Regions:
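Short, hydrophobic/aromatic-enriched beta-strand segments in well-ordered soluble domains
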Residues: 56-58, 75, 148-162, 211-219, ...
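Solvent-exposed beta-hairpin/edge-strand motifs
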Residues: 73-125, 177-180, 216, 220-221, ...
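Glycine/proline-rich low-complexity spacer/linker segments in large multi-domain proteins
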Residues: 85-97, 157-211
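Hydrophobic alpha-helical and helix-loop surface patches within well-folded domains
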Residues: 20, 36-37, 75, 259, ...
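Hydrophobic helix-coil surface modules that form long, contiguous segments used
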Residues: 186-193, 201-357, 386, 398
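Beta-strand-rich binding/interaction modules
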Residues: 224-225, 499, 512-576, 581-591
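N-terminal, polar/Ser/Thr-rich
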Residues: 21-53, 173, 498-500, 504
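A surface-exposed beta-strand-loop module
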Residues: 61, 98-174, 250-251, 578-590
Length: 591
C-alpha cells in the first residue's frame, strides 16, 4: 500500500504551481473568396542616384460580391521622410525602436525614400488619384463588378531610402540594396472591406497573385529574393547548374534579371556586388539559396546550410508541406524580416541560425496562410515563434545543432510572464499599430502568441493540437484566416468547445492563476480544495506524487469545454465533474 505522503502538482496550462501537501478536402467554412492581383513590372535601377524607374501592369480580379468604386495602393517608401507618420510616431512613443529613433527626421533629400506616381490607367483610361502619406487613393472611372477583371497600368519612380527600418540602401553591414516594400502595392480588400493602412512601421497584409518582375541593374550586382529566376544562363552569379555555360546578356553595362513568383502576396529582393551565392538542393528537389557577403562569417554561413535543410524537413512533416520550389536566406535589412520565399537577415550576428529558422517558419504563417498581420500579428509572429522553438528543440535532440552557431533562445513565454504581471499588457486583439508601447506589442505578438499555441496543447491535448496544426495549414492556406477560423479547426479536431479560450486569452488581459487552498486528511481520505485566483478559467490537472514515486492524475475540465481531453500519460487518471467558471473553489478527494 502506498504511503499517504505525497506532493500535489497543480497544472493549469502555461502557468504551473507546485505545492507540497498537400491538399486536403476544403471545408465549406473555408470557401472564402479571395481577391487576386497579377503583377508585371519592369524596373531600371540607377546605382549612382539610388533611384529606379518602373512600369507596372496589374490585372485585378474582383472575386468579392461587392462593386468596387475605388482602389488603394501602398507607397511604403514615402514613410522615410521627415514628418511622416512613421517619423512622428517613432519620436513620440515612449519606447522607440532604437533602429529608427529620430533618424527619419534627419534624412536629407538624397537620403529619403519616395515613390512618385506619374500615371495610373484603368483599362487604358487615365484615373484620378491622390497620394496621402503612404497611401494612394484612386477613384475609378468605372466600378469593378463582382467577378470582373480589370487592368491597371502605372508609371512610377522610386528613390531607395538610407536603410533605417527593413528596406533601404547601404545598411550597417554594407549591403547596397534591401528592396522590400519597394513598389506600389495594391491594398487588400476582403470580407471586412479595404485595408489601406498607413505604414507606421509594423505589419503587412497583401493580395494573392502571380508576379513577373524584370530588374535591370549593373552587371556586377548579384540579386536574391522572391521568385524563380527565368534566365539563369544569361545571368550566372551562381544560378547556373554545374556544367552549364553562361553567356551573359549585358546591355549598357547592365543585366536584366527575370523572375516569376506564383501565388504570393509580396515580392522582395536584395542586391549587392559582393554577395557570395551558395545553394543546397534538398532530397525533395527544393533548393535553398544563401546570399551573404564574401569573406565575412563564412564558417557560420556554411554551417547554417545543412541545419536549414533539417529545419525545412521538420516543418514539412509537422506544420504542412512548403508549397514553393525554393527559399532564399539573404544578408540584408536591419535584423530579420520575412517575405514570400525569402528572408532578409543581418549576417554579423551570433543568432544566425535562430533568426533564420524563425524567419523561414514565417513562410508557413505569414507567407502561405497570410492572416492580416496588422489586425492579428500574434497569429503570425506567435505561431512562428512556437514552431521555430519546436524546431530548435528538435535540432538539439537529434544532435544536428552542434555548431558554432548559437542554440536559439529561451521560450517566448518568458517575455509574456513578465508583461502579464505588469500594468502595460494590452489585449492580443489590439491593432499592431496602436499598442501604447513597442515592448507591449512585441511581447504580445511574439510571446503571448506563442503561449496561445503551446497552452492550447494543455487544453485539448498535445496530440490534438499537433493534428490541428496540420489541418489548419491544409484548410486555410492561401485564404487569409482569422482568429475564429483557427479556433474552429482545433474545435473540430478535439471535439471540445473553445470559444471561451479566445474570449479570455485574446480579447482580455485576464490572467491564469490557480492555487491549492487547503489539504485535509480525514481517515483514509484526503480532501483537496483548489481556488481560482486569476480571472481566466482553465481546465486543471492535479498530479499527485506519492512517497514511493508513483503518480496519479486528477482532472477537472471546464464546463464550458463540453467535454474532456484524453489522458496523455500512463499514470492512473481520475476524471472529476467539470468546474463551472463561476465557482471560485473546487473540492475533490483522494482515496
Amino acid at each position: 500500500m502506498r504511503k499517504r505522503i505525497f506532493a500535489i502538482l497543480l497544472l493549469t496550462g502555461w502557468v504551473t504551481t507546485t505545492l507540497v501537501g498537400q491538399e486536403q478536402a476544403t471545408r465549406k467554412d473555408s470557401d472564402r473568396w479571395q481577391q487576386y492581383a497579377n503583377y508585371y513590372m519592369e524596373i531600371d535601377m540607377n546605382v549612382e542616384t539610388n533611384r529606379f524607374q518602373g512600369v507596372q501592369k496589374l490585372e485585378y480580379t474582383n472575386n468579392s460580391p461587392d462593386e468596387l468604386n475605388q482602389v488603394f495602393y501602398h507607397l511604403y517608401f514615402n514613410a522615410f521622410q521627415p514628418e511622416s507618420m512613421m517619423d512622428v510616431r517613432s519620436r513620440s512613443i515612449q519606447d522607440p525602436d532604437r533602429r529608427v529613433g529620430d533618424r527619419i527626421s534627419k534624412l536629407s533629400n538624397e537620403e529619403i525614400g519616395y515613390q512618385k506616381i506619374f500615371s495610373l490607367k484603368q483599362d487604358g483610361e487615365q484615373v484620378e488619384f491622390e497620394v496621402v502619406g503612404t497611401v494612394l487613393e484612386a477613384k475609378l472611372n468605372e466600378p469593378i463588378q463582382p467577378g470582373e477583371t480589370v487592368t491597371f497600368d502605372m508609371e512610377f519612380e522610386g528613390q531607395v531610402p538610407l536603410q533605417i527600418r527593413r528596406s533601404g540602401r547601404d545598411n550597417r553591414e554594407g549591403i547596397r540594396y534591401t528592396m522590400t516594400q519597394w513598389y506600389p502595392k495594391l491594398a487588400e480588400y476582403d470580407y471586412q472591406g479595404w485595408h489601406a493602412d498607413e505604414y507606421i512601421g509594423r505589419e503587412f497584409y497583401g493580395v494573392w497573385g502571380d508576379y513577373e518582375i524584370k530588374i535591370s541593374i549593373d552587371e556586377e550586382y548579384v540579386i536574391g529574393g522572391t521568385g524563380y529566376l527565368q534566365n539563369p544562363l544569361e545571368i550566372g552569379h551562381g544560378y547556373e547548374n554545374p556544367g552549364q555555360t553562361v553567356k551573359k546578356k549585358v546591355e549598357n553595362g547592365k543585366l536584366t534579371w527575370h523572375f516569376v513568383a506564383p501565388n504570393v502576396h509580396d515580392f522582395a529582393w536584395a542586391a549587392d556586388p559582393d554577395y557570395a551565392h551558395d545553394k543546397l538542393t534538398m532530397d525533395n528537389g527544393m533548393v535553398l539559396h544563401f546570399f551573404h557577403q564574401k569573406g565575412q562569417n563564412e564558417e557560420n554561413w556554411k554551417a547554417l546550410m545543412p541545419l536549414a535543410e533539417r529545419a525545412f524537413e521538420y516543418a514539412n512533416e509537422n506544420f504542412g508541406q512548403y508549397p514553393y520550389k525554393q527559399f532564399s536566406v539573404i544578408q540584408g535589412g536591419d535584423g530579420g524580416m520575412e517575405y514570400p520565399m525569402s528572408t532578409m537577415i543581418t549576417g554579423n550576428r551570433g543568432s544566425l541560425l535562430g533568426v533564420t529558422i524563425h524567419e523561414a517558419l514565417h513562410d508557413w504563417y505569414h507567407g502561405v496562410l497570410g492572416n492580416n498581420e496588422a489586425l492579428t500579428p500574434w497569429m503570425d509572429e506567435g505561431f512562428t515563434s512556437y514552431a521555430s522553438g519546436r524546431i530548435s528543440r528538435h535540432l538539439r535532440s537529434d544532435g544536428s545543432e552542434e555548431t558554432t552557431i548559437e542554440n536559439i533562445g529561451t521560450p517566448a513565454g518568458g517575455s509574456y510572464l513578465r508583461i502579464a504581471t505588469s500594468d502595460i499588457e494590452e489585449p492580443l486583439s489590439t491593432h499592431s499599430d496602436h499598442y501604447n508601447l513597442n515592448g507591449a506589442y512585441s511581447t504580445a505578438a511574439y510571446g503571448k502568441g506563442a503561449v496561445w499555441m503551446s497552452q492550447l496543447g494543455y487544453v485539448i491535448g498535445e496530440e490534438a493540437r499537433d493534428k490541428g496544426l496540420l489541418e489548419y495549414f491544409n484548410t486555410w492556406k492561401f485564404k487569409h484566416p482569422n482568429p475564429n477560423d483557427v479556433l474552429r479547426v482545433f474545435e473540430r479536431v478535439s471535439g471540445l468547445e473553445l470559444d471561451w479560450y479566445n474570449e479570455y486569452f485574446v480579447y482580455t488581459t485576464k490572467n491564469i492563476d490557480y492555487g491549492v487552498q487547503n489539504v485535509v486528511g480525514e481517515g483514509k481520505q484526503t480532501n483537496v480544495t483548489l481556488e481560482k485566483i486569476g480571472l481566466m478559467p482553465m481546465p486543471v490537472d492535479v498530479v499527485v506524487t506519492y512517497k514511493d514515486g508513483t503518480k496519479e492524475v486528477h482532472y477537472m475540465a471546464l464546463r464550458m469545454m463540453r467535454g474532456e481531453k484524453p489522458a496523455e500519460t500512463n499514470d492512473p487518471r481520475v476524471v472529476h465533474p467539470d468546474w463551472p467558471w463561476t465557482n471560485p473553489t473546487y473540492e475533490f478527494s483522494i482515496d
